[in-house]
Amino acid sequence: MSRAKAAPVAGPEVAANRAGRQARIVAILSSAQVRSQNELAALLAAEGIEVTQATLSRDLEELGAVKLRGADGGTGIYVVPEDGSPVRGVSGGTDRMARLLGELLVSTDDSGNLAVLRTPPGAAHYLASAIDRAALPQVVGTIAGDDTILVVAREPTTGAQLAGMFENLR
């Protein structure tokens, strides 16, 4: 007669695989203000999860984590999208995008089928991710720098119409 093993609870056993490790990263970033990958690695190590910088960097990228600085330009903290999933359309995405536009959009500009959005330093990736997740039919995609997002409009929408829409949503 064989005995079934009980499922492990949170700890190194669960985090031994990529999904478990990434779940712990999301939990840590959701509950603590982590300012560096070294700090995150130390927090994981305290839980018995050893990770290389390369693996941690890859995990953060896959989770869509970005380092977000406030408008004062101070030291940034890592944040992950609210649901911790890869970028794709999500329910409630437009509400979240509108909230982030209100918090992060500094100004807009446009040219042809392009809208240019300005944010505080370090916030562009976070806002661009929210725009991508909203899966707006008039948006082909986004490209984000440190404080600037290039949003490509799907024809027949123009960049001016798109910039106006983002202004009105904030």
UniProtKB/Swiss-Prot annotation:
Disulfide-bond pairs as recorded: none
Cell compartment(s), UniProt = Cytoplasm
One of the record's GO molecular function terms: arginine binding
Q: Does this entry carry the keyword Protein biosynthesis?
A: no
Keywords (A to Z) from UniProt:
Amino-acid biosynthesis, Arginine biosynthesis, Cytoplasm, DNA-binding, Repressor, Transcription, Transcription regulation
Main localization (coarse): cytoplasm
Q: Which InterPro entries match?
A: Arg_repress, Arg_repress_C, Arg_repress_C_sf, Arg_repress_DNA-bd, WH-like_DNA-bd_sf, WH_DNA-bd_sf
Which pathway does the database say it acts in? Answer: Amino-acid biosynthesis; L-arginine biosynthesis [regulation]
Q: Does the keyword Nuclease apply?
A: no
Cite a GO CC annotation.
transcription regulator complex
One biological process term in Gene Ontology: protein complex oligomerization
Among PANTHER family, the record links this protein to: ARGININE REPRESSOR
Assigned protein family? Belongs to the ArgR family.
Which purpose does this protein serve, as stated in its record? Answer: Regulates arginine biosynthesis genes.
Listed name of the protein? Arginine repressor
Gene behind the chain: argR
